[in-house]
């Protein structure tokens, strides 16, 4: 009897407890919370993890590792995949962890080595067009060289800031790997691929135009070095392109990279020779020719030339990711752009003071014939050795975006199962080399082409997109002065980009109409 009473009391207590828990759970549910037992808590925690991964997968890009066998899951990756299909499987997570751990063993570059790479990008051959920018801009052109250095340094920093986000513990972690990843994150979730495609198109245009400029400058330099020879500038461009055809067979840049240091040293020697010659004529410098006013029609072209000479944002995310100490990135950007600003300003001013209104689009064309031939031969060698770098980068972007996206690719893979380049893939590479030749033949205007490229893609990749992405991704964390800087850069960059593009086109049309040769 006592046992029966005890069991009934226990049942009543249990039912009361269940009802009270149900009421409390209902109350919490109406407030937006959910009560759970210990066993259910594990399930809810797992669901929360999956939900968090899914939401992050909508916003972040996923790196897919493809293997020749065609099995996309054979090699995993701990990063998010590009197509936003959700988190990888547990097997791929384990393999991705192994790949992450193995990546720690890869050699990293120091801040000095990173600075050397940035210096090579912003102190290349295209500084030869800066005196021409001073010709049409005067002192305002000199100010623009300084201003462009400050802005490009700032936009490079904010572009890298877009690679990072704070986790739940308040720690800043790197969640993106490239310029394309940042663009896709800004357009997600509605258009997760749009931003990356825009950036890819801009990169391809800039890289191909860089290749065209190398062919143009090679033909220009050879023609002006040997004017007595019965060979036109177009013929010299064809000869230069014939030497560049082996670039179509490139599988990697190991062979080319061996010449990078030699190219940089040669260019440094050339700059020293030009400045030394200019200093030898310091008594004849035409200070009165440096204008305080600008040529309204041609100054926007100068803006494009100056901006194009500072472009390095394309490879900054990869460079920062390979640094031993990413914290030193800001310091590295500061001293590289300060050095570039000083050297470019001095080179442009000294060269313009020497030749004043006779300054040509490529400043070495103003040198005496004896010195010009030697200097130009070095420059042509540097241009030909520099051509494979942007060419290979453009080929990689084209192959990844058009030929290597699996089922979503527009065209079949240009590589066979054994990794060899197919014949039609080789034909496309040769066609790209020939395209750069045709553009160089029919548009042989170095400064106008450089101004056009700088206004179109240079301003977009260096000014407009970094400031726009910074506002989009980090809006809630930005202070008022950062918002002001970003908006100002975007507005000024848009105005300069449109005006430079329009005036560069007008300059090209005028050159064709009156058959003006460089």
UniProtKB/Swiss-Prot annotation:
Q: Which reaction does it catalyse?
A: 4-aminobutanoate(out) + n H(+)(in) = 4-aminobutanoate(in) + n H(+)(out); glycine(out) + n H(+)(in) = glycine(in) + n H(+)(out); beta-alanine(out) + n H(+)(in) = beta-alanine(in) + n H(+)(out)
Q: Which GO terms describe its cellular component?
A: cell projection; cytoplasmic vesicle membrane; presynapse; synaptic vesicle
Q: Name one GO biological process term.
A: beta-alanine transport
Q: Could you list which ranges are Cytoplasmic topological domains?
A: 1-125, 219-258, 320-334, 398-431, 476-482
**Chain's gene name:** slc32a1
How does this protein lie in the membrane?
Multi-pass membrane protein
Query: Cross-referenced InterPro entries, in alphabetical order?
Result: AA_transpt_TM
Spans within the Lumenal, vesicle topological domain:
147-197, 280-298, 356-376, 453-454, 504-518
| Sorted UniProt keywords | Cell projection, Cytoplasmic vesicle, Membrane, Neurotransmitter transport, Synapse, Transmembrane, Transmembrane helix, Transport
Which cysteines pair up through disulfides? They are: none
Q: What stretches pass through the bilayer?
A: 126-146, 198-218, 259-279, 299-319, 335-355, 377-397, 432-452, 455-475, 483-503
Q: Please give the name of this protein.
A: Vesicular inhibitory amino acid transporter
Where would one find the signal peptide in this protein?
none
Q: Where is this region: Disordered?
A: 66-98
Return the similarity comment: Belongs to the amino acid/polyamine transporter 2 family.
Q: Which GO terms describe its molecular function?
A: gamma-aminobutyric acid transmembrane transporter activity; gamma-aminobutyric acid:proton antiporter activity; glycine transmembrane transporter activity; glycine:proton antiporter activity
Q: What is its main location?
A: membrane
The protein's role, per its UniProt record: Antiporter that exchanges vesicular protons for cytosolic 4-aminobutanoate or to a lesser extend glycine, thus allowing their secretion from nerve terminals. The transport is equally dependent on the chemical and electrical components of the proton gradient. May also transport beta-alanine. Acidification of GABAergic synaptic vesicles is a prerequisite for 4-aminobutanoate uptake.
Q: Where in the cell is it found?
A: Cytoplasmic vesicle membrane; Presynapse
